Amino acid sequence: MKNKNVIQKMREKTPLIHCITNYVTINDCANILLSFGASPAMCEAYDEVYDFVSISSALYINLGTLTKEQETAAVLASISAKNHNVPVVIDPVGCPAIKRKVEVINRIAEVGRIDIIKGNIGEIKFLAGMDSETRGVDSLDNGENALDACTQLAKKYNCIVAATGEKDFVSDGKRGSVIKNGTEMLTKVTGAGCMLGALCAATCANFEDKLVSTTAAILSMNIAGEKAYEEAQLPGSFRIALIDNIYMISDEEIWERGNVEWK
């Protein structure tokens, strides 16, 4: 896997990532995409999304603060993505607490397309029909059976599924990876998960093996987080250091420093 130049290929293309995301972390997602080497566009008007998806490299749908207007725009955007062969990443933020979000995911799967679902372990286990522990948008789950949950959900939606926590798990229904990098400080800043979803969209835009591209995105965030914590131990300065280290991250670094178990 060390020969997979996921980040290099992404930066060579500067993919346009169309984001329909939440209002809490929209700026964070835009900035981390820019630092990573992608080009963000935060377009969510219903009358604009169909055309804009057609010129985009990937579509990132984050359900964090889902308004009715965002819901209708996201569904239409997913239809355009299906029609124009644009990969779609969905982050089901808070779905155990707000069941309507599951209906939106199922609607997108029905009329559009889903290439990657990226959530925390509690969200992914909930979507897979397993018992999970969550509080609002946060997971309290210990990660037991997380890879099984990813595998089941990947088979259900025929996509890549990533579950993040103390360890991170990725599956395409047959293959999988377990990632053991990261720092607890990533849980002390708002939007780390949302930013990771944006990175997953960037890496999958021009890379065929989306299990590998998703693993690379998670490694990028986790290792940048580790390095940021070496430089800054307080949340405000850590956030800045995280963006800086994403800017400097490379394929060589993530595969050399990455602690990944392939399944």
Curated annotation (Swiss-Prot):
GO terms for biological process: thiamine biosynthetic process; thiamine diphosphate biosynthetic process. Its cofactor is Mg(2+). This is Hydroxyethylthiazole kinase 1. ATP binds at residues 118, 164. Its EC number is 2.7.1.50. Belongs to the Thz kinase family. Keywords: ATP-binding, Kinase, Magnesium, Metal-binding, Nucleotide-binding, Thiamine biosynthesis, Transferase. InterPro entries: Hyethyz_kinase, Ribokinase-like. It catalyses: 5-(2-hydroxyethyl)-4-methylthiazole + ATP = 4-methyl-5-(2-phosphooxyethyl)-thiazole + ADP + H(+). Pathway: Cofactor biosynthesis; thiamine diphosphate biosynthesis; 4-methyl-5-(2-phosphoethyl)-thiazole from 5-(2-hydroxyethyl)-4-methylthiazole: step 1/1. CDD domains: THZ_kinase. GO terms for molecular function: ATP binding; hydroxyethylthiazole kinase activity; magnesium ion binding. Pfam families: HK. It comes from the Bacteria. NCBIfam families: PRK09355.1 (NF006830), thiM (TIGR00694). The gene is thiM1. The keyword Metal-binding applies.
